[in-house]
Amino acid sequence: METFLFTSESVNEGHPDKLCDQISDAVLDACLEQDPDSKVACETCTKTNMVMVFGEITTKGNIDYEKIVRDTCRNIGFVSDDVGLDADNCKVLVNIEQQSPDIAQGVHGHLTKRPEEIGAGDQGHMFGYATDETPELMPLSHVLATKLGARLTEVRKDGTCPWLRPDGKTQVTIEYYNENGAMVPIRVHTVLISTQHDETVTNDKIAADLKEHVIRPVIPEKYLDEKTIFHLNPSGRFVIGGPHGDAGLTGRKIIIDTYGGWGAHGGGAFSGKDPTKVDRSGAYIVRQAAKSIVASGLARRCIVQVSYAIGVPEPLSVFVDTYGTGKIPDKEILKIVKESFDFRPGMIAIHLDLKRGGNGRFLKTAAYGHFGRDDADFTWEVVKPLKWEKPQD
């Protein structure tokens, strides 16, 4: 049996880039909660002792940007300079302007267009992917890397591993078998965890705790064997972390946010963007389409692409590829997809309820992946039943 290795990585919520994603989405939540028609393009950057939010926001809401920044940093665990940032004493800079009137008239006619008339907020192409290798219909390499990162945060916050600090990265290499286009995971080849820690803990204690409290609860035993390689804090020291260790920017972890390197990516980031931005809403609807194709038994693995022009509601193109795993020809699946899903941005926002912010709805998406999550707020993960006739043998 011929196999191959494939690797996906993740970073947890204390990574500086992910901190920025979460702040941008916390701002989006606040805007949509007060004004569902808010137009938001919020970027964040951070470095030692400083966080800056900047971009274009038009909202009727009264937004306290500084409070959102400090609350988000504090909730992640950035409560002192020692851990990489002090939420209560760092500098917070704000440089927000209104959305360009040129864009506003072209996309939503200064809020006068009906939902079906709303144009895409920009050009671009987005991809959705699904695979039957996990119950989430997501790639296993990505699922495990993401769950390891989430577990690192869990054992830090609940006190199981008090030596942990907020910043950390994970990476999982899996040995796969290609079964006529479908991906079948055989075993975990390598697990890599690099996590920020305090001054007192030894490397032996780090390795032992990570195996016992992080890896064992996350990775099913059937995938581990005596040949599995573990790299646990291989650099030997990771005390300085968060924005003190590295600068952070919104939109720098787009593969972690999506499919861990599987499928494809059009390049557009998600966080800090309202649903007229098709980088986000377009990617969400094609994930729902791809997931529904696999869940309905039409294919074992599938990618869907959609593309847009600024100011134009209808997509320019929709593409489906089932990697040879389709039960009927791809062109017939494409027809079903076009009949079942409305790709116009204003209609995506309605069908997926994307104008509803608050309660950390979009903040939740900004760490540990936008897809494959079991949470009612992730409306794009709801499978849409697709009607099709099984071909007669």
Curated annotation (Swiss-Prot):
InterPro entries from the UniProt entry: ADOMET_SYNTHASE_CS, S-AdoMet_synt_C, S-AdoMet_synt_central, S-AdoMet_synt_N, S-AdoMet_synthetase, S-AdoMet_synthetase_sfam
Signal sequence, renumbered to the chain: none
CDD domains: S-AdoMet_synt
Keywords linked to the UniProt accession: ATP-binding, Cobalt, Cytoplasm, Magnesium, Metal-binding, Nucleotide-binding, One-carbon metabolism, Potassium, Transferase
Protein name: S-adenosylmethionine synthase 3
GO function term, MF aspect, one: metal ion binding
Lineage per the UniProt record: Eukaryota, Viridiplantae, Streptophyta, Embryophyta, Tracheophyta
Subunit structure: Homotetramer.
Residues holding L-methionine: E56, Q99, D246, K277
Enzyme class name: transferase
Co-factor remark: Binds 2 divalent ions per subunit. The metal ions interact primarily with the substrate. Can utilize magnesium, manganese or cobalt (in vitro).
Compartment annotation: Cytoplasm
Disulfide bonds: none
GO cellular component entries: cytoplasm
Role according to the record: Catalyzes the formation of S-adenosylmethionine from methionine and ATP. The reaction comprises two steps that are both catalyzed by the same enzyme: formation of S-adenosylmethionine (AdoMet) and triphosphate, and subsequent hydrolysis of the triphosphate.
Enzymatic reactions: L-methionine + ATP + H2O = S-adenosyl-L-methionine + phosphate + diphosphate
Named cofactor requirement(s): Mn(2+); Mg(2+); Co(2+); K(+)
NCBIfam families: metK
Record EC number: 2.5.1.6
Binding site for ATP: D167, G168, K169, S235, G236, R237, F238, D246, R252, K253, A269, K273, K277
